Amino acid sequence: MQQRRPVRRALLSVSDKAGIVEFAQALSARGVELLSTGGTARLLAEKGLPVTEVSDYTGFPEMMDGRVKTLHPKVHGGILGRRGQDDAIMEEHQIQPIDMVVVNLYPFAQTVAREGCSLEDAVENIDIGGPTMVRSAAKNHKDVAIVVKSSDYDAIIKEMDDNEGSLTLATRFDLAIKAFEHTAAYDSMIANYFGSMVPAYHGESKEAAGRFPRTLNLNFIKKQDMRYGENSHQQAAFYIEENVKEASVATATQVQGKALSYNNIADTDAALECVKEFAEPACVIVKHANPCGVAIGNSILDAYDRAYKTDPTSAFGGIIAFNRELDAESAQAIISRQFVEVIIAPSASEEALKITAAKQNVRVLTCGQWGERVPGLDFKRVNGGLLVQDRDLGMVGAEELRVVTQRQPTEQELRDALFCWKVAKFVKSNAIVYAKNNMTIGIGAGQMSRVYSAKIAGIKAADEGLEVKGSSMASDAFFPFRDGIDAAAAAGVTCVIQPGGSIRDDEVIAAADEHGIAMLFTDMRHFRH
């Protein structure tokens, strides 16, 4: 049963006024009486719409600089009144039924994001009347429609037209879900902000306050259900943040191909975040969350050719990310050469998409061009808890490096060292990366001892016939013993970049000097677990 309810009276009170005039005009044209407050009422009146101020309806003025507007029985009685059950008491107290509530809330998130926002500014942007009306209308969704998103305006008008001015229970229930999601997210933002302010509020330093609230409330929106999770016996879904500010796998548009799997998304994220580190045309190939080939080149085709050479075997069934538009030449090279799960780039040319269309199972994503990296949080779920930390956006430049050996690196060694240092940041620890002429030639990932990662990188290079002599090596963390340096020297490495900080640094540096290796300290670690 559809349980339609006609919309005869609507209360509109919005902070974000995008589309509200057109929506109000559409409601009014369909005979809906309009109630409104403050700035919304003034805007509608300026546009010539017949609108009744809530203060005129209640006989009670707005007061306390707008803090009290809608907190009145004639408003909430009209929203909460159960049709057919509360009619008598509503009539006794001259309460008119309100069939639709259109509300969005004070911009708390935007306010606290502004530089220099004070606690007083934040407090004044905590909406009280708005959430109260939203919750009241959502609670009484059996009789009332609650609208919190301007993106729903057109669909609501269409349904009213299809149902003689009424909305179905299914629609009202869906709108109620959105309303409770909206208020939950809003309260979570406030709780997180206040929770992180507690020490500072008691006179402690800003540093003491930190950025982590005492209770962490997170709100993510489900983008899609997965066929399964990391393994076929696990159920899964993909949730994204609202208003993501940086090009990412979460914001990407899928242009073609099968639905993304859980592992596709995880691996695509790893590839995209790595390729973002490079200003020059770059390609990153990822397999099982680890880069298996990375290169920069004169073009993305050149970069892809060089990245592929690192490890063609592992590249099979991998994820390929570019930091430039996918062009026809690169698309053709990929499709002709290998099986690929996902290609992601800021954009793709029409010619490139015609080529990839021949392989309909290949997933092609475009994410838009990115600018500055946006600070944020990383999460790792543990049984019974959640680890939270800042995103690892740290990266050193040449001017921050310390040469700790007798020999200075050559210009090419230095370039390669900085290149493979960027790659090592995205390789699972213990991470070792060999690079030469701006391409990886061997990657050792995820080993329990650093020396074995170094040996594996050398084996990988030898297997592909890539010359290690004169290459640079990056290690994501310090060398606890000299054995990693000995292994690198045996392979032909002539420059090493690493954080330093081991109690045996002197032994490690001495080993480098014995082998004539230049060694650079970054004083920054990039563990990745």
UniProtKB/Swiss-Prot annotation:
A cellular-component GO term for this protein: cytosol
GO biological process, one term: 'de novo' IMP biosynthetic process
CDD domains: IMPCH
PROSITE patterns: MGS (PS51855)
Residues found modified as N6-acetyllysine: 287
EC number(s) per entry: 2.1.2.3, 3.5.4.10
SMART domains xrefs: AICARFT_IMPCHas (SM00798), MGS (SM00851)
UniProt pathway annotation: Purine metabolism; IMP biosynthesis via de novo pathway; 5-formamido-1-(5-phospho-D-ribosyl)imidazole-4-carboxamide from 5-amino-1-(5-phospho-D-ribosyl)imidazole-4-carboxamide (10-formyl THF route): step 1/1; Purine metabolism; IMP biosynthesis via de novo pathway; IMP from 5-formamido-1-(5-phospho-D-ribosyl)imidazole-4-carboxamide: step 1/1
GO MF annotation terms: IMP cyclohydrolase activity; phosphoribosylaminoimidazolecarboxamide formyltransferase activity
Reactions catalysed, as given in the entry: (6R)-10-formyltetrahydrofolate + 5-amino-1-(5-phospho-beta-D-ribosyl)imidazole-4-carboxamide = 5-formamido-1-(5-phospho-D-ribosyl)imidazole-4-carboxamide + (6S)-5,6,7,8-tetrahydrofolate; IMP + H2O = 5-formamido-1-(5-phospho-D-ribosyl)imidazole-4-carboxamide
Domain MGS-like: 1-148
Keyword terms of this UniProt record: Acetylation, Hydrolase, Multifunctional enzyme, Purine biosynthesis, Transferase
Protein family membership: Belongs to the PurH family.
Domain notes: The IMP cyclohydrolase activity resides in the N-terminal region.
Name of the featured protein: Bifunctional purine biosynthesis protein PurH
Organism encoding this protein: Escherichia coli O9:H4 (strain HS)
Name of the gene: purH
